[in-house]
């Protein structure tokens, strides 16, 4: 569960390493974002020479959370870290590679390009 001021690792090769959540999209009083939800964030740490610069405001979709999430079949899924993938305005990923597994919820929320780039879908 990601909320305002949460720091999230970036799981793609855009050049950003860590982002800070500014807003959870999906309603004026929405507090938390889970796997497959879109947030607005600012870049807090970036590699030199990357496409993304520190201080840039970006949109990102959450791909991993440490808070467990209950699936419709009764099972739970949780990861070791909170991670996100930076996206463009049309919901396509900004990077060309994705690192680490992603949640199956991304397929249900129509982020097919992220699912196809990911090495593993859990």
UniProtKB/Swiss-Prot annotation:
**Pfam families tied to this protein:** Ribosomal_L14
Show the GO MF annotations: large ribosomal subunit rRNA binding; structural constituent of ribosome
Mind telling me which Gene3D superfamilies this protein's record contains?
Answer: Ribosomal protein L14
According to its UniProt entry, the protein's GO biological process terms are: translation
Q: Which gene encodes it?
A: rplN
Tell me if Ribosomal protein is a UniProt keyword of this record.
yes
> What's this protein's name?
Large ribosomal subunit protein uL14
What organism does the record attribute this protein to?
A: Rhodococcus erythropolis (strain PR4 / NBRC 100887)
Q: What does this protein do?
A: Binds to 23S rRNA. Forms part of two intersubunit bridges in the 70S ribosome.
Record keywords: Repeat included? no
Q: How does this protein assemble? A: Part of the 50S ribosomal subunit. Forms a cluster with proteins L3 and L19. In the 70S ribosome, L14 and L19 interact and together make contacts with the 16S rRNA in bridges B5 and B8.
What InterPro entries would the database entry show? Ribosomal_uL14, Ribosomal_uL14_bac-type, Ribosomal_uL14_CS, Ribosomal_uL14_sf
Q: Which GO terms describe its cellular component?
A: cytosolic large ribosomal subunit
Q: Give the family, as the similarity comment puts it.
A: Belongs to the universal ribosomal protein uL14 family.
SMART domains from the xrefs? Ribosomal_L14
Keyword list (alphabetical) reads: Ribonucleoprotein, Ribosomal protein, RNA-binding, rRNA-binding
């Amino acid at each position: 569960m990601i909320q305002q001021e949460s720091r999230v690792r970036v799981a793609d090769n855009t050049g950003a390493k860590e982002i800070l959540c500014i807003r959870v999209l999906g309603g004026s009083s929405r507090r938390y974002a889970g796997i497959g939800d879109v947030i607005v964030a600012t870049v807090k740490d970036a590699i030199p020479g990357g496409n993304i610069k520190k201080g840039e405001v970006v949109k990102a979709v959450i791909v991993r959370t440490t808070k467990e999430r209950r699936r419709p079949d009764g099972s739970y899924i949780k990861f070791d870290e909170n991670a996100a993938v930076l996206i463009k305005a049309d919901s396509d990923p900004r990077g060309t590679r994705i690192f680490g597994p992603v949640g199956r919820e991304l397929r249900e929320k129509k982020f097919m390009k992220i699912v196809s780039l990911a090495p593993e879908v859990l």
